[in-house]
Structure formats: structure tokens, C-alpha cells
Amino acid sequence: PGDYGHMELVYDFSAGGDADGWLHALFRYEDRASGHAAETSFGAHVFNTVLTYKGEPQSYAGRPPGLSTRLFLRLGPAPFDTLCHLIYPASTPWHGESATDLELHDAKGREVARRRIAIPCSGSFLFRYGETFDAKTRDRAGDGAYIIIRDLTCRLFGYHGLLRRDGGFSFDHMFGF
């Protein structure tokens, strides 16, 4: 990989000033050859930081945000391959890199395999199920398998979808809690 990436929209408070609202955006992705298109909206969030903004702690359940990730990654049936683009956003500097586990489970919830990846702070990682786990491991996982994406060092964000030779389908974004 190397021909992928992501974009972060941030307010720069280094020179002072004040934000007049949360950043929001609507993105449309289109494959010019196939005509396949996908849209997603994204509202601003404060990621991987312990801070108070305008007198409000940026926390979701009493704890500082950004301390962990638990995502469910649906795996498509053959002939589809599943893709996932994980992003490690940071509103202020956080850990230098993630310690992210991709835990492959069979349909009964038993862990079949685990792979550790490291995503740089403000970086991203694109992977496909078929390239991440070998054929023997995928066969052991069987139909109905899924991946749990787990990280105890940071909160990740991501996109996921299904691919096949003649096209693909993009699902909405994923948040890590």
C-alpha cells in the first residue's frame, strides 16, 4: 500500500481565536471507470486527547475520550473480499503509534487468529481480509466469520466495504468505543 491516505480537518488555535462551530463535511467518492459512487458525512469529533473545550469536558461516558477502540468488522461472503481503512486521528498529540489487534473470529465467536498492527498518530492503515489472513486461516474461520478491531491505546475511526472483481460496495464509517 502507499496509494491511499486520509484527510483531517482541524481548527488551528495556535494563534488564538475561537471556533464558531463544529466542522462538518460531506464527501462523495466516485470511480471514474466503473461509475461506482459512495457518499459519507462526517461531523467533527474530538479524538485522542484529554481536554476541556468551552467549559465542557470532551468525554463520552465520564472517562477521557480516546482511550480504547472496539470495532466489529463484517466480512463479506465469497466472492467478496472485505476492505477496511483505519484512521488514527488526534486533535492534539497522543501516543506515537497505535497497538491495534485484528482478531479473527469464527461464527461461534471463537478466536481463530490475531494480527497486531501499528498505525502512526494522525496516520492510517488500509487492509483487505484476503491479504491479511492466509487462505488456511480464512478456511478455519469459515462462513459467518468476523473481525474485532481492538486497541487499548487510542480511539480509531474507519471505513469498510466489500470488493469483488467487477466492483464494490462501501458501508458507512465506524467509530471506536
Roles of regions detected by a PLM:
Residues P1-F177:
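Gly/Pro-rich, tryptophan- and cysteine-flecked surface segments typical
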